[in-house]
């Protein structure tokens, strides 16, 4: 008899989520049917997109999300007991799956790397950085790249891939600690956007000739300013808008249409799940190789204990994490 603990949405968020918006429930799972497996969560992820996706949940629904899990009981020959998988099981300690949405961790995964990276640098955030920079922005060596939220799970990888491709990289973050981390890991310029006297002047000083590519993780007023610093024919990959996800007032106006028109800018939003099949597997292998070779550095902000899922999520939205926010079950 297995009891699963699950975090559910008690009430919809108003502004930043609070602990009282969540409720921890325990349910008894049924015996396995043929073709099913029982999963036990090892690591769980919290990500900004959950703030938006939670709007589509009904109160009482379990919070969504991926986890690295171990198969602890199996009636499915494709996933024997002990298999490590990525599972979209949500915020739960145990779950039952028929195997259709499970993904085994790469066979070549070395013992020297933590499995939690499959939720970060060698997972969805890493893939977001990879495809957003290489496919959407299409960066080339010698170009100048601006990355907002550069010390986050996605931005930190964007900047390092851009350096691997021979680009000049300017990153912005919200604390001096994060700025120091960016400088340590190869960013040519790193700025604390909260303390610069003028964001426009700071971005201009960092790249007087402008930016070829802007990887946008924050949206809002920051991005309105960043767009003014783009070169003609600049490309903007719109990945996220974390600066406005928790707003309680109307959204402020977007960037000036005149700038977009006369600079002939290309702005494109994207979601990483567009890339599937072999192209996705190649990207995962590339990311794993770069991490294994030390060409990409990672940092995890690990919260211990499944009971602290809400706190980890709230901290992420408030920018308390450096690198990927992970919960160790």
Swiss-Prot record:
Residue list for modification Phosphothreonine: 18
GO molecular function, one term: 2-alkenal reductase (NADPH) activity
CDD domains linked: leukotriene_B4_DH_like
Residues bearing PTM N6-(2-hydroxyisobutyryl)lysine: 178
SMART domains: PKS_ER
Residues modified as N6-acetyllysine: 178
Cellular compartment(s): Cytoplasm
UniProt xrefs under InterPro entries: ADH-like_C (IPR013149), ADH_N_2 (IPR041694), GroES-like_sf (IPR011032), MDR_fam (IPR045010), NAD(P)-bd_dom_sf (IPR036291), PKS_ER (IPR020843), PTGR1 (IPR014190)
Pfam families: ADH_N_2 (PF16884), ADH_zinc_N (PF00107)
Annotated binding of NADP(+), by residue: 152-155, 178, 193, 217, 239-245, 270-272, 321
Modification sites for Phosphoserine: 20
Record-linked Gene3D superfamilies: Medium-chain alcohol dehydrogenases, catalytic domain, NAD(P)-binding Rossmann-like Domain
Keyword Protein transport appears in the UniProt entry: no
Keywords: Acetylation, Cytoplasm, Fatty acid metabolism, Hydroxylation, Lipid metabolism, NADP, Oxidoreductase, Phosphoprotein, Prostaglandin metabolism
Principal place of residence: cytoplasm
GO CC annotation terms, alphabetical: cytoplasm
A single GO BP: leukotriene B4 metabolic process
Function per UniProt: NAD(P)H-dependent oxidoreductase involved in metabolic inactivation of pro- and anti-inflammatory eicosanoids: prostaglandins (PG), leukotrienes (LT) and lipoxins (LX). Catalyzes with high efficiency the reduction of the 13,14 double bond of 15-oxoPGs, including 15-oxo-PGE1, 15-oxo-PGE2, 15-oxo-PGF1-alpha and 15-oxo-PGF2-alpha. Catalyzes with lower efficiency the oxidation of the hydroxyl group at C12 of LTB4 and its derivatives, converting them into biologically less active 12-oxo-LTB4 metabolites.
Subunit architecture: Monomer or homodimer.
NCBIfam families, A to Z: B4_12hDH
Similarity remark: Belongs to the NADP-dependent oxidoreductase L4BD family.
Protein's UniProt name: Prostaglandin reductase 1
Organism, as annotated: Bos taurus (Bovine)
Gene from which this protein is expressed: PTGR1
